[in-house]
Amino acid sequence: MRFGKIDYLNMLPFDVFIKSYPTPCYFKQFLRLKKTYPSKLNESFLFRRIDAGFISSIAGHSFALYPYSLGIVAYKEVLSVLVVGTKNAFDKESASSNALSQALGLKGEVLIGNKALQFYYSNPKKDFIDLAALWYEKKRLPFVFGRLCYYQNKDFYKRLSLAFKHQKTKIPYYILKEAALKTNLKRQDILHYLQKIYYTLGKKEQLGLKAFYRELLFKRIQKPKRF
């Protein structure tokens, strides 16, 4: 079981959950080693260096959706995926967000993850576009930025997904403090941000995914691939 994880604040509730969830010891050992940004994790997954993980939605397009499927979802706004300025520039750490910017026909620099949050909370003028907000304005659907995908051990990941889905995770003070120091964000800002993120893929979320995949097809936006 080689599980890879996005090293962003949006995975903080999962980090807390997995610490106490019963897994083989090597699962958590590998997880600690394999933390990176989305586009790098996609590459590791497509080349089978890992066999499971929360990967970008654009890279997980061929994987089946189940009632228990998990994702990284934002409804109406996300705060951590922004387009700023007028000069086009993709974020090298991103895959789905770059594609979403293209699908929405935007011009500007894409910022994702912790650096986008730093920009959001330090920019009182709010002179940026929140991609989840614009997606909702156009589609009236949530946007799924990432998906839990796996090549094997389906029963294990089904149990894990259901457990995470039904457990309300409270983030301990010391973990919030560590995250605040690491990201240069305030604890209250982190908690505010996490209120915008959820992980269940219900009917609306699956419709949102399908709408995104249609946009990729119609606008001929390239998906990550092995070769």
In which residue ranges do the predicted regions lie?
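Domain-level signature for soluble enzymes in the chorismate/prephenate branch of the shikimate pathway
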Residues: M1-F227
